[in-house]
A protein has these predicted regions:
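Bacterial N-terminal signal peptides
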Residues: 14-25
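An acidic-aromatic pocket/loop used at catalytic or ligand-binding sites
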Residues: 2-12, 28-201
Length: 201
């Protein structure tokens, strides 16, 4: 008798889950905007529980930082990978916003580091971290104490890539500067990350 009740409850539960999934998906709205070349430039997805918005046309004003004088937006690489993005995920439980844009400059990294260390000061104490060009140091961690919300340098803090960080784990601005791969000059990224929720994503 218990097994038949459990089987009945499981089948009812399965039916309810399927019904909810169908209702959620049918209430889902997807909007894709393309550029003049037919490439996707903006995607908006709305569901009853939240939304996802992705745009390849990030606006530098959303980072809260100026563009270094004379710098140029870095073009797509050989793989066709975009060099800017604006991602926004929102729901009643959590949210995540990331704005990132890559640039290149003819000036050496030291000049850019000095420039952005000064510009970041208005947001608080600036942390300087060092790493290799393979390190991606944007961390959004669950924090269990007030100290764990502070920004930190990761790894052994050595290398030719410099990251200037300001803010907290759930509201940070990052400038990542490194020597250009070919020739002289620099490449750099301006990044803004904001999260919200009981436990950070």
């Amino acid at each position: 008798m218990r097994n038949s009740n459990r089987l009945f409850i499981n089948s009812q539960l399965g039916f309810i889950i399927t019904l909810v999934a169908v209702l959620v998906m049918s209430a889902c709205s997807i909007n894709v905007k393309k550029n003049e070349n037919g490439e996707d430039k903006k995607v908006d997805i709305e569901t009853p529980v939240g939304g996802l918005h992705v745009s390849k046309n990030a606006d530098v004003r959303d980072t809260g930082l100026p563009v270094y004088p004379g710098a140029r937006v870095k073009q797509k690489d050989d793989n066709g990978e975009e060099k800017s993005a604006n991602v926004n995920i929102s729901s009643g439980l959590f949210g995540l916003k990331v704005v990132a844009i890559e640039y290149e400059s003819d000036d050496p990294p030291e000049k850019l580091i000095t420039y952005y260390a000064d510009k970041l000061k208005k947001y608080g104490s600036v942390l300087e971290c060092h790493g290799s060009s393979n390190d991606d140091d944007v961390d959004v961690n669950e924090h269990d104490s007030k100290d764990s919300n502070k920004l930190k340098c990761k790894g052994n803090n050595t290398g030719n890539k410099v990251e200037l960080k300001v803010g907290t784990e759930d509201n940070q601005r990052i400038v990542a500067v490194q020597p250009a791969e070919k020739g002289k000059g620099s490449t750099f990224a301006l990044v803004y990350v904001q999260t919200r929720g009981k436990d950070t994503i």
